């Protein structure tokens, strides 16, 4: 049986190809800009991770989507409809916070049951008076007419205020008043744009749905307990559970209300390594099984690479790159992203001609053709893409340090004063002369990142 929220949301949907879109979103706290012109579009059923260091703005984006914060400017669209004026409980989202926010006085079952109190199911069509639908169509026309009149009134007021602001004789107080109204006009328009849809939802909820029964509640709880692996813990108190089990309860409580979008704010950060790995696998399994959109916040690069369909890498309130894990890891847009997303060797490079780059004094073949001759670039080669041997290669160097990592060795090679890191299965003694080389496509060239960064950014 379908959740009524899923049924009602159909009335909101347009033909947008994206489930969620943020368009030109700014967020300010006083004079401090937290988000700067953020544009992000997420498809239905995607697992998207917002990845960035502390203070980058990733959690703010999540809170804007969930309705816990308001944008300063810009649009937040669900299926093409601007919903930034909607309160959290009216959005098709459920949120798992970093501390899980579980009810300590309730059992596992009690926590999962909590969200079901407001859940409603569609009534049996045969029990509904056909006149209800005629009445709904009549009211829709009335609501549409009313909303249009309000929109026209807003247009007129906006035009009037914009004209007034052009006057040079306007006092400072009045100028601020009119400008403040214009700055907030986005929210005023958004309210009336969604007015009809909201009225229809209220009508349908009252006339076309019913409360969920006790048996249905128990059925939903049993299904969810099985889904997240909580069998045998139904009656336990929250204080009796491990971190991993608490996380499962939080997942069950969020998923039982059948949201279209699950928002996860660093939910695994407090778990130890083994439990964290198990929960990562569970998240992937659940997302594929139920098929809803997951938006996951983390500062852990490995976690983002393992979980995501796509990753938005965020820096100082801006999205630096939004792409698949493979594209971001292999083809980062700049040095900052490359350094943040994994181990890397960087080189100062000059593009000398088509398919050639000057690196450490040598002309090295490259697959790149898009840069201008003489252009200064950043070069990237991942440690695992470098071959080390005793046979002649691109550069000769000396092994300075070797670290055993279990399944491989991490070796530091000194090449004319430049330390190059290499991952290899072969052992080389410290002080040994070696040669390093790499495949043609291992060298990735990027335009210089003039913004720069400090080591403590990571």
UniProtKB/Swiss-Prot annotation:
Topology within the bilayer: Peripheral membrane protein
Q: Which SUPFAM superfamilies match?
A: MOP-like (SSF50331), P-loop containing nucleoside triphosphate hydrolases (SSF52540)
Per the record, what is one GO cellular component?
ATP-binding cassette (ABC) transporter complex
Which sites bind ATP?
52-59
The entry's localization annotation reads:
Cell membrane
Q: Which domain of life is it from?
A: Bacteria
Broad class of the protein's primary localization: membrane
Q: Which reaction does it catalyse?
A: ATP + H2O + polyamine-[polyamine-binding protein]Side 1 = ADP + phosphate + polyamineSide 2 + [polyamine-binding protein]Side 1
The UniProt keyword set, sorted, is:
ATP-binding, Cell membrane, Membrane, Nucleotide-binding, Translocase, Transport
Taking every annotated instance into account, which residue ranges of this chain make up the domain ABC transporter?
Answer: 20-341
Extract the ranges annotated as region (Insert). Answer: 120-210
Which InterPro entries is this protein grouped with? AAA+_ATPase, ABC_SmlMolc_Importer, ABC_transporter-like_ATP-bd, ABC_transporter-like_CS, Mo/tungstate-bd_C_term_dom, P-loop_NTPase, Transp-assoc_OB_typ2
* Catalytic EC class: translocase
EC nos: 7.6.2.11
Q: Which GO terms describe its molecular function?
A: ABC-type polyamine transporter activity; ATP binding; ATP hydrolysis activity
* Database matches in Pfam families: ABC_tran, TOBE_2
- Function text: Part of the ABC transporter complex PotABCD involved in spermidine/putrescine import. Responsible for energy coupling to the transport system.
The family database entries (PANTHER family) matched by this protein are listed as: SPERMIDINE/PUTRESCINE IMPORT ATP-BINDING PROTEIN POTA (PTHR42781), SPERMIDINE_PUTRESCINE IMPORT ATP-BINDING PROTEIN POTA (PTHR42781:SF4)
The text of the family note is: Belongs to the ABC transporter superfamily. Spermidine/putrescine importer (TC 3.A.1.11.1) family.
Q: How does it assemble?
A: The complex is composed of two ATP-binding proteins (PotA), two transmembrane proteins (PotB and PotC) and a solute-binding protein (PotD).
Q: What is this protein called?
A: Spermidine/putrescine import ATP-binding protein PotA
